[in-house]
């Protein structure tokens, strides 16, 4: 039966990876005005003899990369990330996967505009920003950031870094250094991405100087992304030790990768020096509208698990350490780390340096921060060909405006029960935060009610508001009527006394008593216009106006009252005063 450990291992093999996000799934799959399109290209600097059976584009030098990507740049794409499939490290046996790289290009589309006005043209530039004898020096990162910032002040947009180590010993795979001129004589099939799924075109490169950006196109048979119909893009330096969008700044790791690949192909450099490492940086240079950018490093602790000298795991609380920077408008660009400081114990911590682009003043007016997705992807390879990776996920999220910012390779490599190799890669994506109204709408369970039910609920709320308003108005009207009736009742008592003194008939007394304290009516209490008019004149003027204006009833009692002499009227006045 077994203890079940093998079952757990098989489940891990099949699992594509963990996904973390600052949003829930319905919000992740909410479309915005912006969408993206990706192109992928895999390449290597290893020769066909050193890496047989690989469909990756073969480059003689890292300096060939701008020329290789020139056509995609002309179509509006620009380099977004560059990384090796496996992070090189000196603590385990090297693998050819350390020397296969992927370059990822991105193109932005604005749905609200018919033309791609936001796709400003770029030119890919490479620069050697540092040459160090001791790359593990603590001054490495500050100097590295300083060089990046100097270039950014000139309008360049930082993409990634490639450390390249030079050894005095030539690579075992090639007997002598390969110059750029000789490297172009190698048979290489080029595949230039076209159409929706970057198809490749076979071309024979010329023998021009590949050190210049627009020079030669180095090519290879078919993309490893054949099953997906897309051209994977990856990056690698002139020596296999190069690191891409995420890399380990380790001299031992870099030197280790030199065993087997071609030696330094850069014709402009002198004989390689022992222990020397050059750090190449990649920049996108805008053709127009250059703006100054600001970059800053963030140190994040990485938890490294080791099985002897082999790295078996690399984890971190990604969002816990990064969410605050995302909310403030920071855009992750690149990540580097060094495993040399890890203790020999089974578990240890090492610092990863993550480089963010600070939000500019003009963008801060429109961008209120970013949401993020972090994917711990297990990429499966059969030999040197990719079987499962993050490409389908990127393409599906591109429709919702998610932008790839960084891919961090790791030295974690496992062999599956089927003989395939899986390696862990950390993929970072960002998107501007959704408007608060959209977030609030998503947070309510409005999907439980149909449109008709929602309409009925709204109508009931409206009726409730109207009923309350009508009730309040009715209460106010009733109160006003009671006040008026009480005043009329007082006047009715007065008139009744006058009528009794003047010998008014019993018929007049009935209506007076019945209408006392009630609303005034034309046929009730106030029927004797003459008598009541004269009598009320001795009281308040307001009573006089009210009674005279409303009394339009029977006239006979009034005429009887007027038949009395003047003395009776005076007596009535005296009685009323009393």
Curated annotation (Swiss-Prot):
Keywords attached to this entry: Cell membrane, Cytoplasm, Endosome, Lipoprotein, Membrane, Myristate, Palmitate, Phosphoprotein
Bias (Basic and acidic residues) ranges: 185-206, 467-485, 506-518, 557-578
Lipid sites, type S-palmitoyl cysteine: 3
GO molecular function annotation: double-stranded RNA binding
Membrane topology according to the record: Lipid-anchor
The UniProt record lists the keyword Transferase: no
Region (Disordered): 169-271, 449-525, 551-578
Source domain of life: Eukaryota
Lipidation (N-myristoyl glycine): 2
Tissue: Expressed in B-cells (at protein level). Expressed in dendritic cells and macrophages.
Comp. bias regions, Polar residues: 169-184
Compartment annotation: Cell membrane; Cytoplasm; Membrane raft; Endosome
Residue stretches of biased makeup (Basic residues): 457-466
Chief location: membrane
TM region positions: none
Effect noted on mutating residue 3 to S: Partially affects association with membranes. Loss of association with membranes
GO cellular component: cytoplasm; early endosome; endosome; extracellular exosome; membrane raft; plasma membrane; protein-containing complex
Gene Ontology biological process: B cell receptor signaling pathway; dsRNA transport; membrane raft assembly; positive regulation of growth rate; positive regulation of interleukin-17 production; protein localization to membrane raft; protein transport into membrane raft; response to exogenous dsRNA
Residue positions where Phosphoserine is found in the record: 183, 199, 220, 505
InterPro entries named in the record: Raftlin (IPR028169)
Protein's job: Involved in protein trafficking via association with clathrin and AP2 complex. Upon bacterial lipopolysaccharide stimulation, mediates internalization of TLR4 to endosomes in dendritic cells and macrophages; and internalization of poly(I:C) to TLR3-positive endosomes in myeloid dendritic cells and epithelial cells; resulting in activation of TICAM1-mediated signaling and subsequent IFNB1 production. Involved in T-cell antigen receptor-mediated signaling by regulating tyrosine kinase LCK localization, T-cell dependent antibody production and cytokine secretion.
Assembly, per entry: Interacts with TLR4; the interaction occurs in response to lipopolysaccharide stimulation. Interacts with CLTC; the interaction occurs in response to pathogens. Interacts with AP2A1 and AP2B1.
Similarity comment: family membership: Belongs to the raftlin family.
Descriptive protein name: Raftlin
């Amino acid at each position: 039966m077994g203890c079940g450990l093998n079952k757990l291992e098989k489940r891990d093999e099949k699992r594509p990876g963990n996904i973390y996000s600052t949003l829930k799934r319905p919000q992740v799959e909410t479309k915005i005005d912006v969408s993206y399109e990706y192109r992928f290209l895999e390449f290597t600097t290893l020769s066909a003899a050193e890496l047989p059976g690989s469909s990756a584009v073969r480059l003689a030098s890292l300096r060939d990369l701008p020329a290789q990507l020139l056509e995609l740049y002309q179509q509006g794409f620009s380099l977004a990330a560059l990384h090796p499939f496996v992070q090189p490290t000196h603590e385990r046996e090297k693998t050819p996967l350390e020397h296969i790289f992927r370059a990822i290009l991105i193109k932005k589309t604005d749905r609200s505009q018919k033309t791609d006005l936001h796709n400003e043209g770029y030119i890919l530039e490479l620069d050697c920003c540092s040459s160090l004898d001791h790359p593990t020096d603590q001054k490495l990162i500050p100097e590295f950031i300083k060089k990046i910032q100097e270039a950014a002040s000139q309008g360049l947009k930082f993409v990634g870094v490639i450390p390249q180590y030079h050894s005095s010993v030539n690579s075992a795979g090639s007997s002598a250094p390969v110059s750029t001129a000789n490297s172009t004589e190698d048979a290489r099939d080029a595949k230039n991405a076209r159409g929706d799924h970057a198809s490749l075109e076979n071309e024979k490169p010329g023998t021009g100087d590949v050190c210049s950006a627009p020079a030669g196109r180095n090519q290879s048979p078919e993309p490893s992304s054949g099953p997906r119909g897309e051209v994977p893009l990856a990056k690698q330096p002139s020596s296999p030790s190069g690191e891409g969008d995420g890399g380990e700044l380790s001299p031992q790791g870099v030197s280790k990768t030199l065993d087997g690949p071609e030696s330094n192909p850069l014709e402009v450099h002198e004989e390689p020096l022992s222990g020397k490492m050059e750090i190449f940086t990649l920049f996108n240079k805008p053709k127009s509208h250059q703006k100054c950018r600001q970059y800053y490093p963030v140190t994040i602790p990485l938890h490294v698990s080791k099985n002897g000298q082999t790295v078996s795991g690399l984890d971190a609380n990604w969002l816990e350490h990064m969410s605050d920077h995302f909310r403030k408008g920071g855009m992750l660009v690149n990540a580097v780390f060094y495993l040399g400081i890890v203790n020999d114990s089974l578990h240890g911590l090492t610092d990863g340096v993550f480089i963010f682009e600070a939000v500019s003043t003009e963008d801060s007016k429109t961008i209120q921060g970013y949401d993020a997705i972090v994917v711990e992807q297990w990429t499966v390879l059969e030999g040197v060909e990719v079987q499962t990776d993050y490409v389908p996920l990127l393409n599906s999220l591109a429709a919702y405006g998610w932008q790839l910012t960084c891919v961090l390779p790791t030295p974690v490599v496992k062999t599956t029960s089927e003989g395939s190799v899986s390696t862990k890669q950390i993929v970072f994506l960002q998107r501007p935060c959704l408007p608060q109204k959209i977030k609030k709408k998503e947070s309510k369970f409005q999907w439980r009610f149909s449109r008709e039910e929602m309409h009925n609920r709204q109508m009931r709320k409206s009726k409730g508001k109207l009923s309350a308003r009508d009730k309040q108005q009715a209460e106010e009207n009733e109160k006003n009527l009671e006040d008026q009736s009480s005043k009329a009742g007082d006047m009715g008592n007065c008139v009744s006394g006058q009528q009794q003194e003047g010998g008014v008939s019993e018929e007049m007394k009935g209506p007076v008593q019945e209408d006392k304290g009630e609303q005034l009516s034309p046929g009730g209490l106030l029927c004797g216009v003459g008598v009541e008019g004269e009598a009320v004149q001795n009281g308040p003027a307001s009573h006089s106006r009210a009674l005279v204006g409303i009394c339009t009833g029977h006239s006979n009692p009034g005429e009887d009252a007027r038949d009395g002499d003047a003395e009776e009227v005076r007596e009535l006045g005296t009685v009323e005063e009393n």
